[in-house]
Amino acid sequence: MELHHPELTYAAIVALAAVLCGGMMTRLKQPAVVGYILAGVVLGPSGFGLVSNRDAVATLAEFGVLMLLFVIGMKLDIIRFLEVWKTAIFTTVLQIAGSVGTALLLRHGLGWSLGLAVVLGCAVAVSSTAVVIKVLESSDELDTPVGRTTLGILIAQDMAVVPMMLVLESFETKALLPADMARVVLSVLFLVLLFWWLSKRRIDLPITARLSRDSDLATLSTLAWCFGTAAISGVLDLSPAYGAFLGGVVLGNSAQRDMLLKRAQPIGSVLLMVFFLSIGLLLDFKFIWKNLGTVLTLLAMVTLFKTALNVTALRLARQDWPSAFLAGVALAQIGEFSFLLAETGKAVKLISAQETKLVVAVTVLSLVLSPFWLFTMRRMHRVAAVHVHSFRDLVTRLYGDEARAFARTARRARVLVRRGSWRDDPNAGPGSGI
């Protein structure tokens, strides 16, 4: 059957797939963003091939990145961040230095190019704000001391993404020129000064007070501010993402913050869905299957390495062991901004298309497995205080409750199937199926 409005039909299919996959992940107590990635996989070349041209959603996905950083900036409570800023900055610097340094050391033994080592090191250093917040919210730990420390580190990492992008872009000239270095230093310095200034006062924007009376204009003005600050940043030869984040920070410390955030979030959620869906379109199962050993080995190395690095950095920051362990495990995945770093590396020819697929594959799998990893390590931390007699005893203590629940569900399903077969077969009796 010929489609008279194929664009509208595809948009409806994309929205339906995102709702179904996002709802399914939420039902399984997983972050909805994992479902959006799954929707992209199902609709993309690795699935049914309904969306074979990723360029069609690339522009909206870029807007999604800007909105994500803008909303993060709006939600940022500078006063609370300043309470943990020393731990957050110290830990983030160690994470970036440790990740990039380790990748550079491993590149000779593993045959990586210099570009892949740099991009992978930067990508591994960043954790997922969306996933970690969702996991901590589900366990009522977001507003605890360890939750606030973890959130502070996530914010510091998000702020570090922009300088890392600027550094990667400078590789296009084969060297970090003084002008590029000055650009990075000035952007970080301006951000620090803005934080210091905003921590002393709350801004009252007269125009937003007037716009608050009209919900449509308030929404439009918020979007205009987001994309306007991003555009100005781009004109100044800085990253548009940097401008969007700064714009969010300014509005987030205004008297009209709650109203503007409420207006911006629905559109931001849609654009964010498109961003994660576009990531799913990038996932190539043929590539993963062909390089399964490499992908799984790198995934295991990254997860274990990040956990150890995070815990070590937090202990050096004088966090107690339980807090360092929980925060370190929660931050063990690779974050959504790693895709942006990988695309930046690809754009400046630091990494090839195949190497980009490797970064994307490891990042997606890391995001999907992150809640399970936190769940497992949390249980192992408890089990460590108990004497374990065997590997079977360890598995029972880790997953015994889930295994028993699964067994009960399986028994009930068997009973229902047998009852159904008795109804279908008039000669069958209650005892015939047992």
From Swiss-Prot:
Entry's Gene Ontology cellular component terms: membrane
Induction description: Induced by low iron concentrations.
Recorded name of the encoding gene: magA
Compartments where found: Membrane
BP-aspect Gene Ontology terms: iron ion transport; proton transmembrane transport
Pfam families linked to this entry: Na_H_Exchanger
Protein's UniProt name: Iron transporter MagA
Highest taxon of the lineage: Bacteria
UniProtKB keywords: Antiport, Ion transport, Iron, Iron transport, Membrane, Transmembrane, Transmembrane helix, Transport
Annotated source species: Paramagnetospirillum magneticum (strain ATCC 700264 / AMB-1) (Magnetospirillum magneticum)
GO molecular function: antiporter activity; monoatomic cation transmembrane transporter activity
Keyword Protein transport: no
Transmembrane domains' residue ranges: 6-26, 31-51, 56-76, 86-106, 113-133, 176-196, 269-289, 294-314, 321-341, 357-377
Protein family per UniProt: Belongs to the monovalent cation:proton antiporter 2 (CPA2) transporter (TC 2.A.37) family.
Function (record text): Iron transporter, which is required for the synthesis of bacterial magnetic particles (BMPs). Probably involved in the transport of iron from the environment into the cytoplasm across the cell membrane, and then from the cytoplasm into the BMP lipid vesicle across the BMP membrane.
Membrane topology: Multi-pass membrane protein
